C-alpha cells in the first residue's frame, strides 16, 4: 500500500492499495449525482473512516460511464473521472471509477491501467501496514477486502 496525493484538492497522504489484479483504479466517493445538464457532482472521500476531514465536493462534465467487474465476476456501471495525483515523486493525470469503498480499509485502489509504464511493483514492500492502519483509525470490518479473497 502507498499514500496518494490529489493535487487539485490539496488532499495528501490518502492510503491506497496497489492491486495488480485490478485493471482500473477506484476512489471512494459519496453523494454521487448527475444533473439534467450533464454535470457530475460527488464528494471525494466523503464518509470513509480513514479520511476524516479530507472530503471535498467536486463537479465536472468530463467523465465517462464504464463497466466494472469485481473479483467475483459481478458487473456494475460506474462513473469514471480524471484527477491529477502524486504517487511517490511522480505527478500525473489518472482515471478513477467512483465507488463506495466505505466498507474497505483503503479508500483508493490503484489498478494496472494507472501503474503501467510508470511504476514497478515490488510485492514484498509496502509503505503502509494494513493492521496498523486499522488500529490507527479504529476500523473493524467483519470482512474486509484482504480477508475476503
Residue ranges with predicted function:
Residues 1-149:
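Pepsin/retropepsin-fold aspartyl endopeptidases
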Amino acid at each position: 500500500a502507498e499514500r496518494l496525493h490529489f493535487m487539485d484538492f490539496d488532499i495528501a497522504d490518502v492510503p491506497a492499495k496497489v492491486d495488480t489484479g485490478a485493471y482500473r483504479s477506484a476512489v471512494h466517493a459519496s453523494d454521487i449525482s448527475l444533473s439534467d445538464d450533464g454535470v457530475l457532482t460527488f464528494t471525494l472521500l466523503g464518509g470513509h473512516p480513514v479520511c476524516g476531514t479530507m472530503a471535498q465536493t467536486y463537479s465536472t462534465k468530463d467523465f465517462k460511464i464504464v463497466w466494472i467487474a469485481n473479483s467475483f465476476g459481478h458487473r456494475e456501471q460506474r462513473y469514471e473521472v480524471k484527477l491529477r495525483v502524486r504517487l511517490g515523486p511522480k505527478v500525473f493525470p489518472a482515471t478513477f471509477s467512483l465507488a463506495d469503498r466505505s466498507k474497505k480499509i483503503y479508500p483508493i485502489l490503484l489498478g494496472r491501467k494507472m501503474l503501467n509504464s510508470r511504476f514497478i511493483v515490488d510485492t514484498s514492500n509496502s509503505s503502509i501496514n494494513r493492521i496498523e492502519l486499522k488500529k490507527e483509525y479504529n476500523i473493524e470490518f467483519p470482512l474486509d477486502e484482504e480477508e475476503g479473497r
